C-alpha cells in the first residue's frame, strides 16, 4: 500500500545493482517476480497526512514477525517511531512534506531480506533513505549495495563492527554505537584506575573477535600491556587457567551470556574472583541473564551460589539506551518524559532497548532531509527533493553530506556521526548483590568518564591491582640470631684465650712439653681466626654498605681459609709425626723436631696464599644480588615478595671453589687416614696423640656437613649463617677441648704425672737435649701386632736363656776356682748360645758403651768365639798361653758381668745409665718381668 508518487508518473527503471549484490538479486529474481509487494504501509498508529501534502518515502527494513527472535526488536521500536513521526509533523519540520515510513519485514533472513528490499525498489515509491537494519547478515548485504542505488541507510540496532568499514559500506550510518565503541570507554576506565596490564578472553565468534582486535589496537597505542590473549570455543576453563598462570588480574571478556556462565564457573574453580581480580564483560546481556543459564551451569557442577560468588563485582560495558541527563532534547522533551510517553504508547508491546535510538533515528532522517531541502533551495538547479530517483547521484550525495552534519541532543544523548559511526554514550554497570547497578558513563563526544559517587564497589579496600605487586625485599641476617651466635663466638674466643694462657704458662711442664706447645699455639690461633670469621659472615646489607660488603667478601674468605689451614695443619703435622714414628720399620731412634712440623704448616699456608692471591688478582669476589621466586605476603596483603639475596661471587666461582675444595679435601682425607692409622696409639709420652686424631675426625666431618648444608640453604641466609656459624663454633670448640682439657685435668689432679712414669726414664744427655728438641718416639704400628708379639716372645725367651747361662757360668767359675791347674771344659753348645747373645747387640744398634767395648774386643780377638774353641787344646807357645785356664778365668770374671750389664737394657733389663757394671742385674729396678707391651726408648722434648 505504497503512496503514489508525487509526479504521478512512473519513474525511470532502476539501475542495475552493484556487482556484489547483482548476482544474488539475479538468482532470486525468478522467485521475486511472482510475489506481491511486502510493504506494511504506514507506520501503525501514525495518522495519515492530508492528501495535498507530498510524502517523503522512507524504506523501513526490520524483522517484525513473532517467529523470529529479533522480531521483538522491530515491534518494540515501532511505538518510538510513531512518537517521533507525530512530533515531527506537529512541528512542521518538513513542511510542506511529511514522512512516509514504509515497513518491510526482513525476518532476519538473507533471502527474505533481499526480497523485501527488491520489492520496495520495484513496487514501492522512490525511497529517499533506508531506515532499519537489525540482523547483521541481512544488514551487511543490503548496505553493501546502497551506493549503487544512491540510498543512505540509517540503522538503529546493528552494532556489528564490520559495518564500520567505510570503504565497503560508505552509505551506511547508525544511531546506535558500534560494539567497538565500548573500547574507548574501556580505555578510559583502565586509565581511571591506573590499570596498565590486562588480559583478554574471547569467544571464537566473529563479532567478539572483531571487538577484541579493535581493542588491541586501542590499548597498544596507549601503552597498556596485554599480557595474555586467550580464546575458546566451548570450554573456557583452560583459557581461564592460563590467564591465572600469567598473573592476569584485569580480564577483558568478549562472550555471550551462555558462555559467561561457564566462564564464571571456571573462574570460581580457579579462584579468579574476589578482591584481587576485576572482570570487564559486555553489558548487553538480557536482564537477570544468570537466572536463565544457571541450570546449565549446574550441569557442569557449578552451583548457583558459586556462580554468583564469581560474578560479584564484574563490570558490564554497553551503550546507554537513554540519556540520564535532565536536558530537553530536540523534540522539546527530556529523555525521562519521552520514556514515559513511550511506555504509554507501546500498550502491551514488549520494550526494546533500541527504542531510543529508533526515536532519535527518525529525528536524524527528518533533520537530514531538512538540510537537503535547504541545500537544494540554495542551489541554482531548482530541483525538488521529491524528484529523487535511484540514479540521481547528486541528490544522493547531498543527503549523504547532510547525514554527516548531524549534531543534536536526543534522548540517547548527543547525536553526532564520525565516519558514519555514532559518537554516543557508554554506560558502566556493576554486578552487586545479585543485581546490576549503574556506576558510571562515558561520553564519546567529550571523551570524558563520569563515575557515579559511591556506587562502584570493590571487594577489597581498594581497586584490584593490575598485576601482583612485587615487593623486592633483601633477605637479611636476623639481628637476634646474629647476637646469639656472636655471643657464643665471644665465649669460644675467651675459652681459646684461656687455653693459650694455660699453654704458655705451663710450656716447661713435661706434660705440655711432650705435646709440642708451639703446635698447640697454632691450633689455638687457627681456632680464634675461625671464630673471628663468624662475625664477618653475619654482616650483610642490613649492617654495612655495598662497598663494605664487597670488601668483606674477600676478608672473610681469607680469614676462614688461613684459620682453617693453621688449626688443621697443626693437627695434621702432629698426627703425621706420630704416624711417621709409629711406622718406623727399622726400629731406629727417630727424631722429628717441631721445626719440621712448622715447615709443614708453613707449606700449607703458602699454598693457601698462592691460591688466594691468584684468586684475588685474576677474578676477585664481587657483590651480586640474586633474585628468587615470588612468595606470598605473610601479612595477607595483595602483594608478592621477591626475595633478594646478597652473594659473594665472581665469574669463575665454580673453578676457584673446586680448586680450594680439592686441595682442602685431599688434605682432610689424608689427615683422616693418618688419624685412623694411629687410632690405637696409647703412649703417655704421646699424651695427646689420640685426642689429636679425634680432632682430625671432628674437623673433617663437620666441614663436610657444613659445606654441603650451606650450599643447600643458600637461599635462606638465616639458616645458612646459623649452620655455618654452628659448624665453626662446634668444630673449633671441640678441637680445643680435646687438645687442652685432658692436659688441664691431668695437671690439676696429678701435676707430676709426666715424671712418675717408671716405664720412661731419660738419660743425662737426653735431659740436656730436652731444652732444644722435641719428643722422639719409637713405636710399632697396630698393623704389625703379630710382629710385636713375636719380638716380645723372643725377648722373653732370650732372657730365660740368660738366666740359664748365668747358672752355667757360675758353675764354670766355681770349677775354675777349685781346679786352677786344669783346663775347664765348656760345652760347645753353651758357647754357641752365648755367642748368639753377644750378636744381639748388633741387631739393636744400641750406643751403650759396655756393648761397644765388648764387641770391639771380640773383633780384635776372634779366638774368643767360644763356639770355635776346643777344650782339649794345650798351650805350646807363649802366644797360646792366653787360652790357659788362668787367662780364661780372668777374662770371664771381668767380661761376663760387663756383657750381662750391657745387654740387658736392650731387652728391658737394667738402665743404661747404671754406672757400675759389677752391680747385680737384680739390683736394677728395671730387671723384672717385662709386661706384654712394647718398650721404647724416648728422648726428651
UniProtKB/Swiss-Prot annotation:
Q: Which residues carry this modification: Phosphoserine?
A: 776, 779, 884, 893, 913, 916, 920, 924
Q: List the disulfide bonds.
A: 108-135, 237-266, 265-302
Q: What is the effect of changing residue 695 to I?
A: In DEE59; full signaling activity in the absence of GABA agonist; when injected into Xenopus tadpoles, causes abnormal swimming patterns and increased frequencies of seizure-like behavior compared to wild-type-injected animals; no effect on cell surface expression
Which cellular compartments is it found in? Cell membrane; Postsynaptic cell membrane
The UniProt entry's GO CC annotations, sorted and at most eight, read: cytoplasm; G protein-coupled GABA receptor complex; G protein-coupled receptor heterodimeric complex; GABA receptor complex; neuron projection; plasma membrane; postsynaptic membrane
Q: What is the effect of changing residue 118 to A?
A: Impairs interaction with GABBR1. Decreases signaling via G-proteins
Q: Which UniProt keywords apply?
A: Cell membrane, Coiled coil, Disease variant, Disulfide bond, Epilepsy, G-protein coupled receptor, Glycoprotein, Intellectual disability, Membrane, Phosphoprotein, Postsynaptic cell membrane, Receptor, Signal, Synapse, Transducer, Transmembrane, Transmembrane helix
GO terms, molecular function: G protein-coupled GABA receptor activity; protein heterodimerization activity; transmembrane signaling receptor activity
Q: Which residues lie on this side of the membrane: Cytoplasmic?
A: 505-522, 573-597, 676-691, 742-941
**Which GO BP terms, alphabetically?**
adenylate cyclase-inhibiting G protein-coupled receptor signaling pathway; chemical synaptic transmission; G protein-coupled receptor signaling pathway; gamma-aminobutyric acid signaling pathway; negative regulation of adenylate cyclase activity; neuron-glial cell signaling; synaptic transmission, GABAergic
UniProt main location, coarse: membrane
Coiled coil, from the record: 781-819
What does the UniProt entry list as the effect of changing residue 705 to N?
Answer: In DEE59; increased basal signaling activity and no stimulation by GABA agonist; when injected into Xenopus tadpoles, causes abnormal swimming patterns and increased frequencies of seizure-like behavior compared to wild-type-injected animals; no effect on cell surface expression
| Phosphothreonine modifications at | 819
Record's keyword annotation contains Transmembrane: yes
| InterPro entries per the UniProt record, alphabetical | ANF_lig-bd_rcpt, GBR2_CC, GPCR3_GABA-B, GPCR_3, GPCR_3_C, GPCR_3_CS, GPCR_3_GABA_rcpt_B2, Peripla_BP_I
Question: Where are the annotated glycans?
Answer: 90, 298, 389, 404, 453
Compositional bias segments (type: Polar residues): 773-787
The Swiss-Prot or TrEMBL record describes its family as follows:
Belongs to the G-protein coupled receptor 3 family. GABA-B receptor subfamily.
Role of this protein: Component of a heterodimeric G-protein coupled receptor for GABA, formed by GABBR1 and GABBR2. Within the heterodimeric GABA receptor, only GABBR1 seems to bind agonists, while GABBR2 mediates coupling to G proteins. Ligand binding causes a conformation change that triggers signaling via guanine nucleotide-binding proteins (G proteins) and modulates the activity of down-stream effectors, such as adenylate cyclase.
Q: What is this protein called?
A: Gamma-aminobutyric acid type B receptor subunit 2
Provide the species name. Answer: Homo sapiens (Human)
Lineage at the top is:
Eukaryota, Metazoa, Chordata, Craniata, Vertebrata
Supply the gene name.
GABBR2
Amino acid at each position: 500500500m505504497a503512496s503514489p508518487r508525487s509526479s504521478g508518473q512512473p519513474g525511470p527503471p532502476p539501475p542495475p545493482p552493484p556487482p556484489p549484490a547483482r548476482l544474488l538479486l539475479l538468482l532470486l529474481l525468478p522467485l521475486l517476480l511472482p510475489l506481491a509487494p511486502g510493504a506494511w504501509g504506514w507506520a501503525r498508529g501514525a495518522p495519515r497526512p492530508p492528501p495535498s501534502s507530498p510524502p517523503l518515502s522512507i524504506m523501513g527494513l526490520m524483522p517484525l514477525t513473532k517467529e523470529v527472535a529479533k522480531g521483538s526488536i522491530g515491534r518494540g521500536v515501532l511505538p518510538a517511531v510513531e512518537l517521533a513521526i507525530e512530533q515531527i509533523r506537529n512541528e512542521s519540520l518538513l513542511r510542506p512534506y511529511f514522512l512516509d515510513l514504509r515497513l518491510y519485514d526482513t525476518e532476519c533472513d538473507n533471502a527474505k531480506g533481499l526480497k523485501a528490499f527488491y520489492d520496495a525498489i520495484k513496487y514501492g515509491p522512490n525511497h529517499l533513505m533506508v531506515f532499519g537494519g537489525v540482523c547483521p547478515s541481512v544488514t551487511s548485504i543490503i548496505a553493501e549495495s546502497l551506493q549503487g542505488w544512491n540510498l543512505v541507510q540509517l540503522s538503529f540496532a546493528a552494532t556489528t563492527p564490520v559495518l564500520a568499514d567505510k570503504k565497503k559500506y560508505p552509505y551506511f550510518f547508525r544511531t546506535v554505537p558500534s560494539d567497538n565503541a565500548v573500547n574507548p570507554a574501556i580505555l578510559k576506565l583502565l586509565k581511571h584506575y591506573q590499570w596498565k596490564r590486562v588480559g583478554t578472553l574471547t569467544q571464537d565468534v566473529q563479532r567478539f573477535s572483531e571487538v577484541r582486535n579493535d581493542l588491541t589496537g586501542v590499548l597498544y597505542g596507549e601503552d597498556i600491556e596485554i599480557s595474555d590473549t586467550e580464546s575458546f570455543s566451548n570450554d573456557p576453563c583452560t583459557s581461564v587457567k592460563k590467564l591465572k598462570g600469567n598473573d592476569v588480574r584485569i580480564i577483558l571478556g568478549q562472550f555471550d551470556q551462555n558462555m559467561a556462565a561457564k566462564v564464571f564457573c571456571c573462574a570460581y574453580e580457579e579462584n579468579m574472583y574476589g578482591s584481587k581480580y576485576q572482570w570487564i564483560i559486555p553489558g548487553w546481556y538480557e536482564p537477570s541473564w544468570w537466572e536463565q543459564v544457571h541450570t546449565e551451569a549446574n550441569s557442569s557442577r557449578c552451583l548457583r551460589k558459586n556462580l554468583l560468588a564469581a560474578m560479584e563485582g564484574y563490570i558490564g560495558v554497553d551503550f546507554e539506551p537513554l540519556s540520564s541527563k535532565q536536558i530537553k532534547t530536540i523534540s522539546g522533551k527530556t529523555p525521562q518524559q519521552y520514556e514515559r510517553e513511550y511506555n504509554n504508547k507501546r500498550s502491551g508491546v514488549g520494550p526494546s532497548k533500541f527504542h531510543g535510538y529508533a526515536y532519535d533515528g527518525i529525528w536524524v532522517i527528518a533533520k537530514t532531509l531538512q538540510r537537503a531541502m535547504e541545500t537544494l533551495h540554495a542551489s541554482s538547479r531548482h530541483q525538488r527533493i521529491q524528484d529523487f530517483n535511484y540514479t540521481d547521484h547528486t541528490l544522493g550525495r547531498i543527503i549523504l553530506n547532510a547525514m554527516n552534519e548531524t549534531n543534536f541532543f536526543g534522548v540517547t544523548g548527543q547525536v553526532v556521526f564520525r565516519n558514519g559511526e555514532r559518537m554516543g554514550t557508554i554506560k558502566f554497570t556493576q554486578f552487586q548483590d545479585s543485581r546490576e547497578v549503574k556506576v558510571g558513563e562515558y561520553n564519546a563526544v567529550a571523551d570524558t568518564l563520569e563515575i557515579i559517587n559511591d556506587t562502584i564497589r570493590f571487594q577489597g579496600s581498594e581497586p584490584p591491582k593490575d598485576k601482583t605487586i612485587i615487593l623486592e625485599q633483601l633477605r637479611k641476617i636476623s639481628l637476634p640470631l646474629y647476637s646469639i651466635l656472636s655471643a657464643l663466638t665471644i665465649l669460644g674466643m675467651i675459652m681459646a684465650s684461656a687455653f693459650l694462657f694455660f699453654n704458655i704458662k705451663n710450656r716447661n711442664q713435661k706434660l705440655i712439653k711432650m705435646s709440642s706447645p708451639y703446635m698447640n699455639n697454632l691450633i689455638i690461633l687457627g681456632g680464634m681466626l675461625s671464630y673471628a670469621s663468624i662475625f664477618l659472615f653475619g654482616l650483610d646489607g642490613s649492617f654495612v654498605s655495598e662497598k663494605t660488603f664487597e670488601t668483606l667478601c674477600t676478608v672473610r674468605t681469607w680469614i676462614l681459609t688461613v684459620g682453617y689451614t693453621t688449626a688443621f695443619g697443626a693437627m695434621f703435622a702432629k698426627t703425621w709425626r706420630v704416624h711417621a714414628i709409629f711406622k718406623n720399620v727399622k726400629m731406629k731412634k727417630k727424631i722429628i723436631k717441631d721445626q719440621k712440623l712448622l715447615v709443614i704448616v708453613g707449606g700449607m699456608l703458602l699454598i693457601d696464599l698462592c691460591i688466594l692471591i691468584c684468586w684475588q688478582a685474576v677474578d676477585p669476589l664481587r657483590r651480586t644480588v640474586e633474585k628468587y621466586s615470588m612468595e606470598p605476603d605473610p601479612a595477607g596483603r595483595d602483594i608478592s615478595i621477591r626475595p633478594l639475596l646478597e652473594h659473594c661471587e665472581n665469574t669463575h666461582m665454580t673453578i676457584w671453589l673446586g680448586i680450594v675444595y680439592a686441595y682442602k679435601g685431599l688434605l682432610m682425607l689424608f689427615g683422616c687416614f693418618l688419624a685412623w692409622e694411629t687410632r690405637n696409639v696409647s703412649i703417655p709420652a704421646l699424651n695427646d696423640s689420640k685426642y689429636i686424631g679425634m680432632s682430625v675426625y671432628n674437623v673433617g666431618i663437620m666441614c663436610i656437613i657444613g659445606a654441603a648444608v650451606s650450599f643447600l640453604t643458600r637461599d635462606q641466609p638465616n639458616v645458612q649463617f646459623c649452620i655455618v656459624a654452628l659448624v665453626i663454633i662446634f668444630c673449633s670448640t671441640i678441637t680445643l677441648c680435646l687438645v687442652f682439657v685432658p692436659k688441664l685435668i691431668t695437671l690439676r689432679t696429678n701435676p707430676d704425672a709426666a715424671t712418675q712414669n717408671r716405664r720412661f726414664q731419660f738419660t743425662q744427655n737426653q735431659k740436656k737435649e730436652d731444652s732444644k728438641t722435641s719428643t722422639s718416639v719409637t713405636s710399632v704400628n697396630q698393623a704389625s701386632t703379630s710382629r710385636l708379639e713375636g719380638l716380645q716372645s723372643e725377648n722373653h725367651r732370650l732372657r730365660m736363656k740368660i738366666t740359664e747361662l748365668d747358672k752355667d757360668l757360675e758353675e764354670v767359675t766355681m770349677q775354675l776356682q777349685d781346679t786352677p791347674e786344669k783346663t775347664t771344659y765348656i760345652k760347645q753348645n753353651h758357647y754357641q748360645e752365648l755367642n748368639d747373645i753377644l750378636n744381639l747387640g748388633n741387631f739393636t744398634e744400641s750406643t751403650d758403651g759396655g756393648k761397644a767395648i765388648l764387641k770391639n774386643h771380640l773383633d780384635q780377638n776372634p779366638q774368643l768365639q767360644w763356639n770355635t774353641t776346643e777344650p782339649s787344646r794345650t798351650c805350646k807357645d807363649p802366644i797360646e798361653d792366653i787360652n790357659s785356664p788362668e787367662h780364661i778365668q780372668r777374662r770371664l770374671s771381668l767380661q761376663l758381668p760387663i756383657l750381662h750389664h750391657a745387654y740387658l737394657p736392650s731387652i728391658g733389663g737394667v738402665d743404661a745409665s747404671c754406672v757400675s757394671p759389677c752391680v747385680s742385674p737384680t739390683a736394677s729396678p728395671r730387671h723384672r718381668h717385662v709386661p706384654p707391651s712394647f718398650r721404647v726408648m724416648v728422648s726428651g722434648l
